[in-house]
Each structure stands twice: as structure tokens, then as C-alpha cells.
């Protein structure tokens, strides 16, 4: 992982930890048990209040069309292989940033009722807050990249 990406992930980790004591950091570049290839989730947290894992997948640069499919596959692996039986389904956060936009997508709906999804949102940073943070970090990322080029 390049140093700039690592710095962005470090700042995102700090952002989530600053959201309160419910966010417990589990790991960065957390390895996922996939047969035949190496795979990692960028940041993994445990949310104590929601009793679930929060998996953050960061993509800087041009968004690839299969990102959502890979993200969903990773969430299924985490639910099957990493989460404990007493924990709720994993929440996924897909963060994509390029020169034109920042995209923040929560993956909550896989096995939750609409009422549960609404309840979860009050414990998580808003999409707008995450977009603003991602925009700030991406601008910093672009500035550093341009200086290094």
C-alpha cells in the first residue's frame, strides 16, 4: 500500500474513533480468508452499540464498475468467517473518491428490516459527514501527489 493511501486510511480511522466510544478499531488491511487470492478490507471496526462489525472499503482514483460486487462479496465473507454468532450483520461502508466526486455508500439492507436500518443510521456518521471528510482527505491526497510528481 502506498504511503499516501495509508495516510488517508489513518485519517479515516481517526475520524471514526472520534465518533465516540462505540467505535472500536479492529484492524487495517484486515485479511479475509479467500481461496486462491489475497484479499483485505481497508478498515474494520466493532460498533459496541450496534453489536456489529463495520467494514470500510476505500477506493481512490477512477471508480471501477465491479467495486460494489467485490464489496458485497467481502461483507459476505466477513459475516460468514469473521463475525461471531451473537453479533449482528456487518455494515459495509464503500468510499470512492476521484477528481470529480466523492461517493459514500452504506451497505445495511442485506438482512435488516427497514426499521432496523433506520435505527442503525442514528449511530453512524451521516453520508454527508463522510463525504465531506473524504473530500478533505482526497484534496490533501491530490496536493501531495502533485508535489511528488
Predicted features and spans:
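Charged, terminal alpha-helix-loop-beta segments
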Residues: 1-149
